[in-house]
Amino acid sequence: LKEKLSGLDNLIIVNTCAVTGEAERQCRQTIRKLRRENPDARIVVTGCAAQVAPQKFAEMPEVDLVLGNREKAEIEKYISAPLEEKTIVGDIFNYDSYDKYLITGFEGRQRAFVQIQQGCNHRCTYCIVPYARGNNRSVAEDEILRQIRELLEQGFEEICLTGVDACSYQPSFSGLVRKILETFPHLPSLQFGSLDPAALDDDFIELVKKYANIHPHFHFSIQSGDNMILKRMKRRHTREDVINLCAKIRAVRPDATFGSDFICGFPTETDEQFQNTVNLVREAGITRLHVFPYSERSGTPAALMPQVPVEVRRERARILREQGEHCDD
């Protein structure tokens, strides 16, 4: 991208986030600040918030152009000449292919990331991401292997597979992992981004058992330890599934450690239901916690549910973070 945009020193590209309403607000705040500091610059806004709410950004006088997530892959085409339209955002669900590109910028590090898929077919009630990224689109296996080969030739020792919903890789996530490990037997460390507990099958457990170069830390997107809250979130696992999964992995890899994302104060969550999350952390042996107080996101079903007071959400998040700090005790 830097090569494509070389010579355009007066261009500012803002890649926005839409995960929460607060993230979107901060994006708008950043755009205003950039305009004040760069009055003559051309400001192009793209990314997830631009895809979900293009009109909000187009109405900002500080913004010159709004591009959707698909259009940003061809950003040089849209900024090379003046355009009559200020907003160019296509329907993200109309795209069924994945743009091939190698993620760069890992110079000086041991670990590099390879994105294996984009989008998500699930509709968790708190999440706007599918409307920003579209449905699941998997990168061709040959392209993934090519990228890994190139990164290994550059001297990287750790490869981390990532994606919006990496476990939904088609035709098979476990099959892809097996192919990578068979193709690169001397790969020092294969790691994973966030993993969906509902999608990890016995084939994956067997791979963890067989290949010592699978990194023994596994990060799951659990979100809650209460089955009713999980159901209202439209998650596909139960607390029992999580406990069993951790036990299975630990049985074949005693050195395994686990981390997870958790949302505290999801709509309708009671004190007892929150306590089930606290208990799950201990029962499953989860030691690295990414804890977030629930944040309403307009356009999601959860935003229409009865809300937990903000101060209660923050207090529960504080309690769970403290629990995480003592997990290794």
Regions found by a protein language model. Give the residues of each.
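Contiguous mid-protein beta-loop-alpha structural module that forms a pocket-lining wall or clamp
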Residues: 269, 285-286
